[in-house]
C-alpha cells in the first residue's frame, strides 16, 4: 500500500472554504502564542524558574504537535486529491501519538510543580531543583515516544483491506478500522496506553489540585484566596479540556459516539487545545505580561 485517502471532515465546498480560513487562523494563533512564550521566557531572567521551564517544554510540544497535523488540513480542504503517502501517514501517526502523550504527562508534572509551590513555598526551590525538572521533562518525552513506538508498530503490522480512512489525519483508531483481521489485541493495547498516558497524569493533576485547594482554604485573606482560586481555575479549565476530550475518544464506550463525533473530538484536542494552552497558562499570567511589557518598552525605546 503506497498511500491513504483521507475523507476529511466534510465534502461541502462552502464549508471547506470557511474551515480553511478558520484552521489557518487557529494555527497562526498557536504559532504566535507559543513562540511568544518561548521568547519571553528566554529573554526575561525572572522567568527562569521551574514553572516556566515546564511551560517552555509544553510550548515546544504544542508547536510540534500542532505542526504534525494542522498544516496538512487546509491543503486537503481545497484539494480534490486528499491522499497521504504511506510513510508520511506512519510518521504523522507516530509523531502525534508521542507528542500527545508527552503533553498529558507534562500537564501532570506541571500540576505537581504548582502544588509544591503553593504547599511548600519556602522549600520550593530546594524540592524543584534543576535536576528534578530536567528528569521529569525528559521522562515525559521518553515515555511519550516509547508509547508511540509500541502503538505505531502494532498498528502498521496489521494487514489492511483498503486505504480509505474516514478521518482528517492518520489516527490510530481510524487506521485500525482498515484492518482485515481481528483487532481486539490492538484495542486492549490502546486502552492500556490510554490508562498509562492519560489517566495516571490526570489522577496526579486531581491530587495536586486537591492539595492546592486545601492549602488555599487556609489563606485568611479573602482577596488572596479569590486570586489563588481564579488562577487554579484557569489552569484547571485547560487541563479538563485536554484530558476530557482524550478520555472521551480513547477510553469512552465505543457505542457512545459516531465516527464523525470522534473526528470532532480529535479536532478539538489536536487544534484547539494547543492554541488555548499559551493563552490560559501563560498570557493571563501577570509575570508573563510584565515580561511582555518590558520587551515592548525596550523596542519602543530603541525605536
Report residues per predicted region:
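Transmembrane helical core of 7TM receptor-like proteins
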Residues: 1-303
